[in-house]
Every structure is written in C-alpha cells, then in structure tokens.
Amino acid sequence: MAEDFRLVYNKAWALFSGVKAMDREQAFRIMNTLRPIIDERLIYFAYYNDEPIGFFIMVPDLNRVIGSFNGKFGWWNKLRLMWALKVAHKADRIFGLIFGVTPEFHGKGIEAGIIRAFEKEVPKLPYNSLELAWIGDFNPVMMRMMESYV
C-alpha cells in the first residue's frame, strides 16, 4: 500500500510548486504511523493494468474519542484509544485525508469511480458522517465533484 500511495502521490502532487516528491522511506513511515488507526475499509485504490492510478485514504476521526484525554496521551490513553476504535467503534465520523488521481487519468471518471465504490460500502460501516480535508483551488474538477455530493 505504501508504494502504491507514493507512486500516485508523486505523479499527482510533485508537479506543483512547493511540493516535494516522496521517497519510499517517507511513504513507509507515513503508513506505519497511520497503521494503528487505519480502518482498511476506508482506503480505496484504483488501478489500470496493475498500476496504481488513484486513491482515497480516510481514517476514523479521532477528535471525538480523544477529547476526554485532556491533552494527555500516555500508555493508558493509547490503550483507551485502541479500545474505542477497534472494539467499541466509538469513532462515528470519517476524516478524508487525501484523494488523488494521476494526471493522465484526470477526466476519465476515475474520481467518480472511487467515490462510487466508497458510496456503495458506506452504509455497511459504523460511521455516520465524512469530513474532507482541504481541496486546493487549483483542482476545480475535485471541487465540483465534492460540491455535487454534498
């Protein structure tokens, strides 16, 4: 997953000013950092000829769970967080971290396909809302697509 993420990320974002290409080590560090909170049902990749061409990566929104931790995140609260996420399913909202499609597949329905795949699965999931992270104003296609789903 980390390598597929890196390949799409580098093709989709590294061409923008101020964005550096991601190396393998950095991609693996990011995924390892996210691993404890990842719900695999919230990660979607699109492929063409076995090559990754897009992704939508979401995580459970931790804010409602960690609010009672009062800013402390020692071992006890880490255990409480894992229990809340993995056993009690206390996180009822999803946070969309990143969505991307490689430039050569823009305008070919990949974005809509990924959203549609998620839309079909969401009723089966224990979440009731989705918050999307920032969408750059340089990406009018994504802005229009998100506006049509809201």
Model-found features: residue ranges?
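Conserved GNAT acetyl-CoA-binding A-motif
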Residues: 92-95, 122-136
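Alpha-helical subdomain
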Residues: 64-68, 142-150
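Conserved beta-strand-loop-alpha-helix junction that forms the acyl-donor binding cleft
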Residues: 99-106, 131-142
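A conserved beta-strand-loop-helix scaffold within acyl/acetyltransferase catalytic domains
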Residues: 1-100
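Conserved acetyl-CoA-binding loop-helix of GNAT-fold acetyltransferases
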Residues: 93-101, 106-122, 148
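Low-complexity, glycine/alanine/valine/leucine- and proline-rich hydrophobic stretches
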Residues: 73-86, 113-122, 132
